[in-house]
Amino acid sequence: MSGSGSEQTPRLTRSSSRSTLTGVASGRVEKIRSSPKSLDRIAKKYKDFDPETAKIIRADLEETQADKTMEVGGSTQESAQQITGAKRPNEEDQGGAQEAAKRVNRSNKVNSLLTSNGVTDPAKSKISNYIVGRLNANNIEADSVMVAECTNIAIHAWKEGKKYLDDKIISQATTTIPTLITNLVSNANTLSNVIASLNNVPDKLVSDIRTQVENVSNQTGQKAAKRDVLLKSSESIYNNAVKESKVDFINNYLTSSGVNVDELRKDSHHYRTVVSRIEKKYTVLVMMPEHEEHHTLKEKVATNRTFVKESAQTLSQKYVTQ
């Protein structure tokens, strides 16, 4: 944001029903109210998630409708909604085809990085959708806030995902966080470097990383409103990524236990019933503490396969493979 005179930093204040962005650039105040959302429509859109996840998504979509409007260069810039390359609202007169092509390119780049880092079929991944959505939200190709946000996304999503989906134990090597983040923020083309550095970032430093992202964003001139959106986004992305990785782990676990997951998921009630039975009898599918390494998790699940198969078989024979 540019301005003359004694420019002050906008503030984002939040209440239970609305968010208000106040700024003094250009001598005016922007007041933004969140738009009502159809919870049924949102719930249907994310039908693959369990109720706990649906609550997270609904809360994020409801509360951030106002938050996702940021003042950039003296004008408000509305965020994109879902990410597919489709036109944004009121885009027809603003080079819609060109912007849609850019969004497709962003999506392809993110999915390529996901594939190279072991995420199967990333185009169907909620993690992929969330990352591309946040990039599209500002429609900016190279912006330090977006790079910092991608850092949070990568650290949170892939680190948590690797706990469940990767045989490789995450390295606990130390990393100089301020240097890492400073380099990432100063270079807007380092998403691949973020991905490459993940195995060197211990879980316990995630909160330090988030703090450093905020500090560096502030030091490089980013405004408080954008910083608030960045941090809020990283938290919601974290929650969704953790849940997505857990869903993937559960499905892989069910398959390896002789359960026909595709058939089971056709009945969402039966699917939740089986998962609930497993979680009540064993804590193995509950989020593991940070000190629990992946090989320990695999040892625990190895003894539970018969119970898993029988849990599905009692509902219907068609849910088990021969």
Curated annotation (Swiss-Prot):
The lineage of its organism: Viruses, Riboviria, Orthornavirae, Negarnaviricota, Haploviricotina. Residues 1-46, 60-117 are annotated as: Disordered. Residues 11-22 have a biased composition (Low complexity). Phosphorylated by host kinases. Residues 28-46, 60-70 have a biased composition (Basic and acidic residues). This is Phosphoprotein. Homotrimer when phosphorylated. This trimer is stabilized by binding to the L protein. Binds soluble protein N, and ribonucleocapsid. Residues 1-10, 74-84, 107-117 have a biased composition (Polar residues). The gene is P. Non catalytic polymerase cofactor and regulatory protein that plays a role in viral transcription and replication. Stabilizes the RNA polymerase L to the N-RNA template and binds the soluble protein N, preventing it from encapsidating non-genomic RNA. Keywords: Chaperone, Host cytoplasm, Phosphoprotein, Viral RNA replication, Virion. The keyword Cell inner membrane does not apply. It is found in: Virion; Host cytoplasm. The keyword Phosphoprotein applies. It comes from the Viruses. One of its GO terms (cellular component) is host cell cytoplasm.
